[in-house]
Amino acid sequence: MSIEWYAVHTLVGQEEKAKANLEKRIKAFGLQDKIFQVLIPTEEVVELREGGKKEVVRKKLFPGYLFIQMDLGDEEEPNEAWEVVRGTPGITGFVGAGMRPVPLSPDEVRHILEVSGLLGKKEAPKAQVAFREGDQVRVVSGPFADFTGTVTEINPERGKVKVMVTIFGRETPVELDFSQVVKA
């Protein structure tokens, strides 16, 4: 018995449906002793909405993929679990070369589980940045409202952006929250 993690292709945007279909098939075929976990890795990110409101949302780390912890059977003769996964509506196949799926390495599994918050300490949601260094932005709130400038530095951990704005004819660096600026 070799329990490994495998990646399977799904139709993009249909990951939840494919997962639900697979979980139903696992129960229907009584394969709880062969297929242990089905995972759609996600992470929490902070998105800035109109009006500067912050919203924490879950984003898929690998759109179009499910990760399955299962016992695939021996090299020559894959077990019934392999066929059940392959025949699940919404799943297009295993990731791997040839007929035999390639298991994920322990490092890959650890990374996926850590980023998903399923292993180790849970990190604060990351801010999703809608702009890059060099982009023109407009300040929408605070003492510099209605100024425009160029992004010179982004600090996603702190949710801050440094913008060069022109004040009285001089370029001046100003540190602002992500919620205070929008792309110009």
UniProtKB/Swiss-Prot annotation:
GO terms for cellular component: cytosol. Pfam families: KOW, NusG. PROSITE patterns: NUSG (PS01014). The lineage of its organism: Bacteria, Thermotogati, Deinococcota, Deinococci, Thermales. NCBIfam families: nusG. SUPFAM superfamilies: N-utilization substance G protein NusG, N-terminal domain, Translation proteins SH3-like domain. Residues 133-163 form the KOW domain. It comes from Thermus thermophilus (strain ATCC 27634 / DSM 579 / HB8). InterPro entries: KOW (IPR005824), NGN (IPR047050), NGN-like_dom (IPR006645), NGN_dom_sf (IPR036735), NusG-like (IPR043425), Rib_uL2_dom2 (IPR014722), Transcrpt_antiterm_NusG (IPR001062), Transcrpt_antiterm_NusG_bac_CS (IPR015869). GO terms for biological process: DNA-templated transcription termination; regulation of DNA-templated transcription elongation; transcription antitermination; transcription elongation-coupled chromatin remodeling. Participates in transcription elongation, termination and antitermination. This is Transcription termination/antitermination protein NusG. Belongs to the NusG family. Keywords: Transcription, Transcription antitermination, Transcription regulation, Transcription termination.
